[in-house]
From Swiss-Prot:
Assembly information from the UniProt record: Interacts with MED25 and TAF12B.
The entry's DNA-binding region: 81-139
UniProt protein name: Ethylene-responsive transcription factor 1B
Motif Nuclear localization signal: chain residues: 165-181
Gene from which this protein is expressed: ERF1B
Length: 218
């Protein structure tokens, strides 16, 4: 049987074909030029032809992929989670803990600017209740130092968690008062036709949230 003439992928190469030419122009020129003889009934020749064709197609794919732009994938940095800390919708962080001295009731310790501050407040409460057996976010040494810095003390018969809550509440009030006094000194306030509402503070709002959560939990 006479061998069939099968178009070879490389039969179209000529001096006119340049490196910058596209695969389309290469295939179009190859259809009008020389052909290599392959016997369609010869398995070895057809296998060789298949390898040549596959190699050519892979070359086209690799060449095209080099021209594709590389997309940078930005990974969102996940926030570190701390024990006893919740993020509030307005961006601040609340610390809370279950008071083992009062039948495990959940106590809101306060709202803080950062998750680390809230986590430290939780650690202070946990350490004051359970001592070295407490599971903490930070090291016990750091927690002990922070308790010394805020001059933490509590009376016998009083919950150490409640004492810490009062301590944080007093510190927030003092900080807010200093901030308001500073703002008032640096600006003049015009009160013509202005209705002034009483600022109940974050603590009141947090207590409302805490009471609603407790009513749904217990």
């Amino acid at each position: 049987m006479d061998p069939f003439l099968i178009q070879s992928p490389f039969s179209g190469f000529s001096p006119e074909y340049s490196i910058g030419s596209s695969p389309d122009s290469f295939s179009s020129s190859s259809s009008n030029n020389y052909s290599l003889p392959f016997n369609e009934n010869d398995s070895e020749e057809m296998f060789l032809y298949g390898l040549i064709e596959q190699s050519t197609q892979q070359t086209y794919i690799d060449s095209d992929s080099q021209d594709l732009p590389i997309k940078s994938v930005s990974s969102r940095k996940s926030e570190k989670s701390y024990r006893g800390v919740r993020r509030r919708p307005w961006g601040k962080f609340a610390a809370e803990i279950r008071d083992s001295t009062r039948n495990g009731i959940r106590v809101w310790l306060g709202t803080f600017e950062s998750a680390e501050e809230a986590a430290l407040a939780y650690d202070q409460a946990a350490f004051s209740m359970r001592g070295s057996s407490a599971i903490l976010n930070f090291s016990a040494e750091r927690v002990q130092e922070s308790l010394s810095e805020i001059k933490y003390t509590y009376e016998d018969g009083c919950s150490p968690v409640v004492a810490l809550k009062r301590k944080h509440s007093m510190r927030r009030r003092m900080t807010n008062k200093k901030t308001k006094d500073s703002d008032f000194d640096h600006r003049s306030v015009k009160l013509d036709n202005v209705v002034v509402f009483e600022d109940l503070g974050e603590q009141y709002l947090e207590e409302l949230l805490g009471s609603s959560e407790n009513s749904g939990t217990w």
